[in-house]
């Protein structure tokens, strides 16, 4: 009887902890949803060539959209001063300019909204003393990453305003990668508040090994996201629109045509796409193997469900990637592919959480 009572203590503490922190977890998950939307809108902004349509960074005044014809003419004239207009969109009409302007405008507006949705509840929870010191430091760290992301976004845009017609693929990849880091941090903290303690029916040693495997997969997915940023940055997806071979080659002959050799991994369309495919193939083989290993353990229902969702998202994301490639990067499928990357990453994080 005493044993049952003592076993119920950790459960009671866990339930109390979860109940106290549930509003904070919900708030963070809402922020995750907004960051997810931000990543998707950012993808559309890139795919439609809209990212350089606003050539100034005005965090406060920039919230107000153009109102009359005169405002629009001023914005278009500023756009005409950058290389992209001269070399890519020369002769663009005002209506055509509006089409690219609104995507960039809403992308920036969504960033400002995320800042408010994060900052205001954070201050509220701090004032109400709902956040302890450790959690407060984590949340402050996330806020700092968000501020850095705003600066990174403008730093990326600057790379396309002077000498280039597109933004730097390095800065684009850093901007995308930082968005995933912010998303992961908020998701991890939120899910930790919802389920801070997990118990497993399997032996701890096997679960620990599986957890290390899960983290390896999560890291590999993140590397694939960064690789996708490079693919997008140099428009590598519009070449080699065949599968599974690259225009008939397993290893294309143009892999190392640039000097010095390491430039090929960042600037060579052939090598950048090959690397993205290679990482995808590693995941295609690794995640089913992980799923098979997980099935051999007596995980909780939610743990098994997380593993099933990871495998399902892999299949969906692989299908979206292949379709996007074969159709030469159409807007709909390319956007879905970017959204799928977030969902696959989320599934991997959820698996890691359930194994913690």
Swiss-Prot record:
The keyword Cell membrane applies. It is found in: Cell membrane. GO terms for cellular component: plasma membrane. Its main location: membrane. Keywords: Cell membrane, Heme biosynthesis, Iron, Membrane, Metal-binding, Oxidoreductase, Transmembrane, Transmembrane helix. InterPro entries: COX15/CtaA_fam, HemeA_Synthase_type2. Pathway: Porphyrin-containing compound metabolism; heme A biosynthesis; heme A from heme O: step 1/1. The chain crosses the membrane at residues 24-44, 106-126, 139-159, 174-194, 214-234, 278-298, 309-329, 331-351. One of its GO terms (biological process) is heme A biosynthetic process. It comes from the Bacteria. Its EC number is 1.17.99.9. It catalyses: Fe(II)-heme o + 2 A + H2O = Fe(II)-heme a + 2 AH2. It is a multi-pass membrane protein. Heme binds at residues 276, 337. Its cofactor is heme b. One of its GO terms (molecular function) is metal ion binding. Catalyzes the conversion of heme O to heme A by two successive hydroxylations of the methyl group at C8. The first hydroxylation forms heme I, the second hydroxylation results in an unstable dihydroxymethyl group, which spontaneously dehydrates, resulting in the formyl group of heme A. Belongs to the COX15/CtaA family. Type 2 subfamily. Interacts with CtaB. This is Heme A synthase. It comes from Nitrosomonas eutropha (strain DSM 101675 / C91 / Nm57).
């Amino acid at each position: 009887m005493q044993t049952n009572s003592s076993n119920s203590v950790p459960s009671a503490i866990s339930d109390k902890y979860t109940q106290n922190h549930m509003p904070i977890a919900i708030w963070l998950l809402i922020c995750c949803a907004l960051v997810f939307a931000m990543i998707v809108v950012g993808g559309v902004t890139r795919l439609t060539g809209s990212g350089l349509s606003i050539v100034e960074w005005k965090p406060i005044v920039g919230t107000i959209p153009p109102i009359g014809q005169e405002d629009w003419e001023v914005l278009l004239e500023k756009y005409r001063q950058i290389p992209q207009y001269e070399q890519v969109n020369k002769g663009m009409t005002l209506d055509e300019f509006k089409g690219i302007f609104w995507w960039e405008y809403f992308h920036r507006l969504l960033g400002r909204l995320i800042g408010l949705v994060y900052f205001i509840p954070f201050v509220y929870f701090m004032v109400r003393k709902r956040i302890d010191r450790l959690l407060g430091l984590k949340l402050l760290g996330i806020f700092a990453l968000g501020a850095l992301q705003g600066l990174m976004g403008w730093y990326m845009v600057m790379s396309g305003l002077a000498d280039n017609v597109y933004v730097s693929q390095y800065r684009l990849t850093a901007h995308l990668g930082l968005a995933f880091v912010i998303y992961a941090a908020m998701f991890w903290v939120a899910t930790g508040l919802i389920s801070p303690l997990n118990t497993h029916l399997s032996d701890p040693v096997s679960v620990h090994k599986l957890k290390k495997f899960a983290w390896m997969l999560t890291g590999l997915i993140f590397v694939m996201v960064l690789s996708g940023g490079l693919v997008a940055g140099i428009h590598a997806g519009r070449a080699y629109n065949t599968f599974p071979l690259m225009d008939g080659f397993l290893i294309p002959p143009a892999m190392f045509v640039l000097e010095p050799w390491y430039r090929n991994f960042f600037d060579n369309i052939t090598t950048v796409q090959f690397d993205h495919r290679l990482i995808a193939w590693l995941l295609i083989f690794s995640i089913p193997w992980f799923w098979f290993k997980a099935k051999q353990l007596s995980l909780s229902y939610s743990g098994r469900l997380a593993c099933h969702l990871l495998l399902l998202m892999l299949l969906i994301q692989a299908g979206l990637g292949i379709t996007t490639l074969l159709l030469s990067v159409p807007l709909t499928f390319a956007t879905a592919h970017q959204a799928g990357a977030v969902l696959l990453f989320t599934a991997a994080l959820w698996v890691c959480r359930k194994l913690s």
